[in-house]
Structures are given as C-alpha cells and as structure tokens.
Amino acid sequence: MKARFDKIYKDIVDTIAEKGIWSEGNVRTKYADGTAAHYKSYIGYQFRLDNSDDEAHLITSRFAPSKAPIRELYWIWILQSNNVDVLNELGCKFWDEWKMQDGTIGKAYGYQIAQETFGQKSQLHYVINELKKNPNSRRIMTEIWIPNELSEMALTPCVHLTQWSVIGNKLYLEVRQRSCDVALGLVANVFQYSVLHKLVALECGLEPAEIIWNIHNMHIYDRHYDKLIEQVNRETFEPAKIKINNFKSIFDFKPDDIEIIDYKYGEKVSYEVAI
C-alpha cells in the first residue's frame, strides 16, 4: 500500500501544472536575495484524507520533516504562544524571518487560539468542551483571521479556520486555507493537522475519521517548480506509522510524545523559502 497523501499531493501538483496560471506584475513575496518570487497558482481545491488509522501523513517522494511541524503545532495550539524565542527553544526556526522587534509574530496564530471563546479559556478549550458536551453542534469552529487585527500580525494566517463535526462517534475535521505554498507549507500543515485531529479525538473519546481540506489559492513558486514536478514523479513508498505515546490530556501533550515508525522516503530536496 502506498502512502495516501502521496497521491493527493501529486494530484495537487499536476492540477497546478496543467491548469494553473503564472503570476504577473508586482508580487508581495520575495526570496532572500530580494528577487520577486513569482508563482503558478490554481484557485479552489478540496481533498479528503482518511485519518482513521495509524498512517502518518508524510509524503515519501522526499524527506518531510516531522519534528519541527509538531513543535510548531505545540507552540500554536497547546502553548498558545506568539513568542518566536519560545519556538526557537523548542528547536523550530519556522518563524525566524517574521520575528518582530518585540520577539513575537504579533497578534497571529497562538495569540488568537488563546482568546477566550464563549466563556471557555481559549478557542481550543471551546472546541473540546463542545465536542464533549454538545457533539451534535454545527458551531464547533476556530478562526484566527480577525479583520481588525490583521495589521498587527507579522504575517496573516494561511491556514485560518477549522470546523469539527461528530457523526456516529466519528470526528471529522474541516480545514480552510487561504494560501498554500505547495512545496513547503502544505507538507507540514497536513501532517500537523492530522496529528491535531488525532489528539482532539483522543481527548474527547472519539474516533478520527476524515479531514476535509479546502484551499483557495494553491501555488508553486518559480524556483520550486521544476524540482517539484520531478519530485512527484518519483517512486513512492509504503507509509510510515504514527504513534502517540503517554497520552493523558491534549493539554499535557508534548512534541516528543509523537513517534514516527518506519519512515521511508526518496532523495532529499531543498526549497527556498519565499518571504
């Protein structure tokens, strides 16, 4: 059996290659050398990912880091922090390019998850409470796209909305992503949210079912394009397994509780970050 996410990932890249349109004119994103980072994009895409078993949703066509994405997940959702130094101490450098003078990323990501919601301590506490006490609700959501605070964020959120639904003791997660860097961001994000889905299911005594992922603008940057096309046409491998150790509560979760077993992958590929 091949890894499920490999096929989904190749379908995404193929869709952009076949139907996408290259950006023109001025673009916000730049490479470290100051060159404009143009991209080929496709608007409006959805995929569904079965997260019901112990398959780790890591691509196998190249090495996909697992530790740094989980540390970022922990920083945003459990620590509910926006302090880049705290993330660095965890061994993750994802946000170094966007660190503001006060050492934070402003009112973004963990700052918004930490906001009190309907009398609950945070958005995550609200989700957990509703799933346990009111599982039939269609209002179990988190949102970190806050219009009147966007100007105070180092970077506006890419993945910004989650919605959680229970049907027959099975937990479904829907994710909404406004902007998707396919070579780098998507690979980390899908793994992160597959783990979050499992953690919330464990906390609430539910079975994880599908993740429904909605992307508005998915794109491949010009300096990524040829390498990514080559990458997704490589041989892929049997999926790794994921194990969550020492689970007591989602609020006691630590990054080292995640164990990845038998991860096989192709030759490593490096991609420049577009800032």
UniProtKB/Swiss-Prot annotation:
- Annotated positions binding (6R)-5,10-methylene-5,6,7,8-tetrahydrofolate: 181, 274
What Gene3D superfamilies does this protein map onto? Thymidylate synthase/dCMP hydroxymethylase domain
**Family annotation (InterPro entries):** Thymidate_synth/dCMP_Mease, Thymidate_synth/dCMP_Mease_dom, Thymidate_synth/dCMP_Mease_sf, Thymidylate_synthase, Thymidylate_synthase_AS
Q: Which family does it belong to?
A: Belongs to the thymidylate synthase family. Bacterial-type ThyA subfamily.
Describe its partners and assembly state.
Homodimer.
What domain of life does the native source organism fall in? Answer: Bacteria
The pathway that the record names for this protein is:
Pyrimidine metabolism; dTTP biosynthesis
- Provide the residue positions that the database annotates as binding dUMP: 138-139, 178-181, 189, 219-221
Q: Which reaction equations make up its catalytic activity?
A: dUMP + (6R)-5,10-methylene-5,6,7,8-tetrahydrofolate = 7,8-dihydrofolate + dTMP
In its keyword annotation, does this UniProt entry include Transferase?
Answer: yes
Keywords assigned by UniProt? Cytoplasm, Methyltransferase, Nucleotide biosynthesis, Transferase
CDD domains found in the cross-reference section: TS_Pyrimidine_HMase
* Principal subcellular localisation of the protein: cytoplasm
Per the UniProt record, which EC number(s) apply here?
2.1.1.45
What is one Gene Ontology biological process annotated in the Swiss-Prot or TrEMBL record? dTMP biosynthetic process
Into which EC class is this enzyme placed? transferase
Q: What is this protein called?
A: Thymidylate synthase
Q: Tell me which residues this entry annotates as catalytic.
A: 158
Q: Where in the cell is it found?
A: Cytoplasm
| Function statement | Catalyzes the reductive methylation of 2'-deoxyuridine-5'-monophosphate (dUMP) to 2'-deoxythymidine-5'-monophosphate (dTMP) while utilizing 5,10-methylenetetrahydrofolate (mTHF) as the methyl donor and reductant in the reaction, yielding dihydrofolate (DHF) as a by-product. This enzymatic reaction provides an intracellular de novo source of dTMP, an essential precursor for DNA biosynthesis.
Q: Which HAMAP family match?
A: Thymidy_synth_bact (MF_00008)
Q: Name one GO cellular component term.
A: cytosol
- What SUPFAM superfamilies does the record tag this protein with? Thymidylate synthase/dCMP hydroxymethylase
One Gene Ontology MF term: thymidylate synthase activity
| Gene this chain is encoded by | thyA
